[in-house]
A protein has these predicted regions:
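Acidic/His- and Gly-rich active-site-bordering loop/insert found
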Residues: 2-95, 330
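Acidic/histidine-rich catalytic neighborhood of metal-dependent amide-processing enzymes
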Residues: 103-171
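Hydrophobic/aromatic beta-strand patches that form the interior of the parallel beta-sheet core
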Residues: 66-68, 122, 153, 324
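Acidic-glycine-rich active-site phosphate/pyrophosphate-binding loop
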Residues: 73-86, 149, 164-175
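Short glycine/serine- and small hydrophobic-enriched flexible loop segments
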Residues: 17, 107-114, 198-205
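Glycine/serine-rich anion-binding loops at beta->alpha junctions
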Residues: 89-104, 182
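Metal-dependent amide/peptide-bond hydrolase catalytic core
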Residues: 3-6, 23, 157, 164-165, ...
Length: 346
């Protein structure tokens, strides 16, 4: 019991150290230098640094390889850059998302040289910004073999539950046209914003699918997230644009999802209107049949649920590597002014 308490105390301390190192996206060098220095003390690891990404691998001693991955960056500060520490919790930006998970990865890499399967630890940059900047893509472009594994587990905050797969995400813009006129003579024009009434009703009434896949219930969603339009207080607007977010369950692909949304919205469109996909990231299958993941769930009696958001498990799924989310911290606290991680969760 004494050794267990010491180990937990060290993990908590390491998490606090990591939280104290600012690492907003594109500014991760300091925290990556810290991690690299720690890893250099483990002679059983082969370490590769590519930009602000680090991959540490054990040798090939078994027939299976497990990859543990985590991003080192955080979102910009929003009132949570003042770090607080109590006996039970650490408050601060990145504490839940995901420096508790990074601390666990780093501790395992440094303290467990003899593992049941071969290990790959991936500390990567720029997850919290547009996907094109993601450090995993930088690693793949330079040395893709470093990301080969039989299973990938990302240490995103899941409150210690397995969150299987992930839902895909798509963003659309819908631009509707009108005709400009003076508001004193609206019959001489056509109000583009008024044309939104039918579109908004259709989206509000949209019945989302809730498929159960490998025992996990996913919940698709369709939401308007932005409305743009208007010229001046006395002008009938001749254009308006909606931004729409669609979450896609992993039992179908993005092409099928796009066709459905186009079928939903095209009845409200006319010549000159435009519906565009401006961003898309695919879903990932649950992967619960993977023997390493199955053994882990059964041995530790872990709860399993669907991942409703999008994470980089989709990157690995696209590479043919089953992947899941599993880490300390409450995801609902991520990116908030009250972001924190509890000792018990770590």
């Amino acid at each position: 019991m004494s050794d267990e308490k010491t180990e937990l105390s060290d993990l908590f301390k390491l998490t606090h150290e990591l939280v104290c190192i600012p690492s907003e996206s594109f500014k991760e060098k300091a925290i990556v230098d810290f991690i690299a220095d720690k890893l250099s003390k483990a002679p059983w690891l082969n370490i590769t640094r590519i930009g602000d990404n680090i991959v540490a691998k054990t040798g090939e001693k078994t027939e299976k390889r497990l990859l543990l991955g985590g991003h080192t960056d955080t979102v910009p500060a929003q009132g949570n850059d003042q770090i607080r520490l109590s006996d039970d919790s650490i408050w601060g930006i990145g504490s839940a998302d995901m420096k508790g998970g990074i601390a666990i990865m780093l501790s395992l890499a440094l303290n467990v040289p003899d593992t049941a399967v071969d290990m790959t630890y991936v500390f990567y940059a720029r997850e919290e910004v547009a996907h094109k900047h993601n450090g995993l893509l930088e690693i793949e472009a330079n040395q893709p073999e470093l990301l080969t594994a039989d299973l990938a587990i990302l240490g995103e905050p899941t409150s210690g539950n397995i969150e299987a797969g992930c839902q895909g995400t798509m963003r659309f813009t819908l631009e509707l046209k009108g005709e400009r006129a003076h508001t004193a003579r609206p019959w001489m024009g056509r109000n583009a914003i008024h044309r939104l009434s039918g579109v908004l009703a259709a989206i509000s009434d949209y019945e989302s699918r809730n498929p159960v896949i490998e025992g996990c219930q996913y919940r698709e969603a369709l939401q308007v997230v932005k409305v743009e339009g208007g010229i001046a207080g006395n002008v009938v607007p001749d254009s308006t644009t909606l931004t729409i977010n669609h979450r896609v369950a992993p039992d179908r692909n993005l092409e099928t999802a796009e066709k459905e949304i186009r079928c939903l919205l095209e009845p409200f469109m006319e010549a000159g209107d435009k519906l565009k996909v401006i961003d898309a990231a695919p879903p990932a299958k649950p992967g619960l049949s993977n023997p390493i993941l199955t053994s882990m769930i059964e041995t530790h009696q872990l709860d399993v649920q669907a991942k409703l958001g999008w994470t980089d498990v989709a990157f690995f799924d696209q590479k043919g590597v089953p992947a899941a989310n599993f880490g300390p911290g409450d995801a609902t606290l991520a990116h908030t002014s009250n972001e924190q991680v509890e000792r018990s969760s770590i």
